Amino acid sequence: MELIRGLHNLKNHSSCVVTIGNFDGVHKGHQKILNKLVSLAKKKGVPSLVISFSVTPEAFFGRTKAKLSSFRDKHLFLESLGIDKHLLIRFNREFSEVSAESFIGDVLVKRLGIKHCLVGDDFQFGKGRRGDFAMLKKASHRMNFIVEEVEELNLENNRISSSAIRGLLLKGDFRQAEEYLGRPFTISGRISHGDKRGRTIGFPTANIGIRRKISPVLGVYSVVIKVRDEEHVGVCNIGKRPTIGGSKVLLEVFIFNFNEEIYGEYVSIIFKQKCRDEIKFNSFDELKDQIKQDVETSKKYFKGENYLT
C-alpha cells in the first residue's frame, strides 16, 4: 500500500474510489466501509484510496480522546484489508479553514479524479463541519461522481463505534471490545531501556514508551506478549507509576518465565483481563506484595484460559 504524506506529495490521479475518516481502531464498522471500497475498486479497475488525518479534528481543537491505535498499526490494518493508497493529510490551522466546497472541488475532484465516494452515516467535513452526505450528493451530480452512504454496523442493537470501544476498555470488557474490533485490543511498540527499578524487587519489566497523551486503558492487566512471532503471557502496568512520582504514561510488562534480551524489539501487548486500577503505595515493600498478587491473579486467569504459564 502506498502512503502519501500530505497534499503537497499528492500527484494528480485520473481516477480512484475514496473514503474519508479517522478510522481510529479500524473496527468492524470501519471494515464494512473499507471492504466495500476494495470491492468497488476492483470492479471499476481503479485504485482504492483512504483519506485520514495526522491528528483528528477533535484533537486539533482541544477535544483530545484516547486513541485506540497508533498510526503505524492503523496503516498496517488498512494494508491488510487490501487498500491501495493511504493519503495522510496534515490537519493544521490552514487545513481547518478549507471549506467543504473547496475540499470537494480541489481535492476530491481535481487532485484525485474521484469516481466513487463511500462515507459513513455520520460523516461531516470542511470548515465548521458544514459538509455532509447531502452536500456530497448534490456536488456529485454536477461533478460526475457517485457518492454512497454506508449504514452503521450494529451488534445486539448497539452501534459499533470508536467511542463505544473506549467505553468497553474503560470497564475492562475486553471480550466485547474484541467483538467490536474484530480482533483483540492490542498496544504495540518498541522495547526501551527503563530505570530498572523492577529488577530491585524481583520483577524485571520490559518497557514501552506510549506516545499518546491519553491512554484508553490504565491500570494493571493480564496480557499476552507477542515478540519474535512467539506468544508469552505476563502482567503489565500502564500508567504514570504514582508510587515513584512518575509523570508520563508508560507501559511496563513482566513476562512470566522469560529472560531473553529484547531491547529494541517491536512487540505487541494483547490485553485480556483487568486486574486492578493503578495505586500509589507507601513503600516498595507494599508495591512488591501487590505485584505478587497481580502475578498470581494473572496466572490463575491464564490457567483457566488454557494458556501455558
How would you name each of these model-derived features?
Residues M143, G194-T309:
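Phosphate/ribose-recognition catalytic cores of enzymes acting on nucleotide-derived substrates
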Residues K65-K74, V98-I104:
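Glycine-rich, highly charged phosphate/nucleotide-binding loops
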Residues E97-P204, R228, N282-E286:
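Classical nucleotidyltransferase
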